[in-house]
Amino acid sequence: MKHLTQNKTVIDWIEEKIALVSPDEVMWIDGSEEQLDALRTKACETGEMTKLNEDLLPGCLLHRTKPNDVARVENRTFICAESADQAGPTNNWMDPAEAYKMLYDIARDSYKGRTMYIIPYSMGPVGSPFSKIGVELTDSIYVVLNMAIMTRVGKKVMDTLGDSNDWVRGLHCSCDIDPEKRYICQFPQDNTIISVNSAYGGNVLLGKKCFALRIASYQGWKEGWQAEHMLILGLENPKGEVKYICAAFPSACGKTNLAMLIPPEGYRNKGYKIWCVGDDISWIRKGPDGRLYAINPENGFFGVAPGTNEKSNPNALAATRKNTIFTNVALNLDNNTVWWEGLDKNPPENAIDWQGRPWNGKTSEEKGAHPNSRFTAPAVNCPCISSEFENPAGVPISAIVFGGRRAKLAPLVYQSRSWNHGVFVGSIMASETTAAAAGAVGVVRRDPMAMLPFCGYNMADYWQHWIDIGAGLDEDKAPKIFNVNWFRKDDDGNFLWPGFGDNMRVLEWIIKRCEGKVDADETAIGFVPKAEDINLEGIEDEVSEDQLKEILSVDNSLWEDEAKGIEEFYAKFGDRLPKALSDELNTLKANLEK
């Protein structure tokens, strides 16, 4: 067999895995359009994919996974570090030797009658100093075609790797899609990922969460950079100056919507624009000028389809109009297009649902699309994609924003007093599960820096790494750190802030703070805007001045309860908890007593 590379470490590993899984055929993915086209045709012939309407959705395909294989599985995801302590209390741990044995037993001969596809891919622009290379072996054309959208694939990647051994090994085996034998295992010390018995996106597109967050966060810890679950956006002012923001939110907090925000009309008329560099993952390093720079290591968007529409996110919708793969959405048989809940108010009557069954959207009680159905769309399709998207040096970060969903606790926005205080703010990030009763507070789920399911090593060490990164930055060069909460409610359970495009008003205040152009009020938790500094032009009818004051208010008694919750959470980490964070918690408590 002719390999696409002379790299001995790559060839040896592939030969070893061929012997393990016994494929009938082996195919290197060279990245050429001809080869990808042939694979699309083959997938449609075998029924693995369905070709959609060429006039309305050119180059688009539909795929359905098995009904028992529709989401990431956190309880089947393991960090196989040398000790349980290295994985930490927030991760599932498995002994590496035991894990390899178990996984190899499951994988053995699982490619019989199948083709092995070898996908060389780059996370980040090929050749960028930020970028890292991986090789994924898979028996799924669906995986190949998704990876060709989500990453940079092909021969140029292997040429860039040369003889280096700095690459991430990834083995994916669909096996029988048996949920009892489904495992997604990361081996940080070995730069290795093994995924078995799944064919769903996040579990099998190994460049995404497995590599770009779990493995890369560990690499960043060892190499002095950061892999973060953050969007990157550029805010352009009327003078044409662009400032960049990284932002981390737990799921269901509107990350993709914020990354592709369309400013309110008043802002657009003045010449404000938002540019999307990335909607999910940031790799961050210190640049030659002492500032932090970020790249989006991905090459596409793997977005949740339900709820995406012309109003909530027109840019994301536009990105899906060509060369996109849809997973587990409904198929409209009348015009061979796709539909999902929240797309419009007009569900098709003659359709096939996500499970492949006839479906009438007007009469059915069941959903046509799975709630976690997805689109995989090329980044270049997005109308607001940043001109810096391919910049190998990344973009300079002015602000880091954390956020969550809190009905009463956090104000609309506040700024940390310092870098370490900002790390504290990120470490206590949480969302309340939405409660049915109006105004009732849901269960608080801590999700530090939105990395709870994605941190590849002990979370306490991860926080210390944040503190160390900050210690290496000059204060005037370090990004300012903020927390936002679009989800504050009144006593009747109504949202107090309109959200969506109007979040631009908060981003504007954040940038003004970074530029030293506005003052703020100091509270027990940090700096909160003066009400007059949040621009309400055009939404005066929706947000009264009293309402704005309510959204910006800090209730110390609620924060006293919160401090107890933080203390309980921190206790999980024992003496590994960075002293800087326990100091910040003590400062918060002291401030609340004043």
Question: Language-model segments: which ranges?
Answer:
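Hydrophobic positions on the alpha1 helix immediately C-terminal to the Walker A/P-loop
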Residues: 258
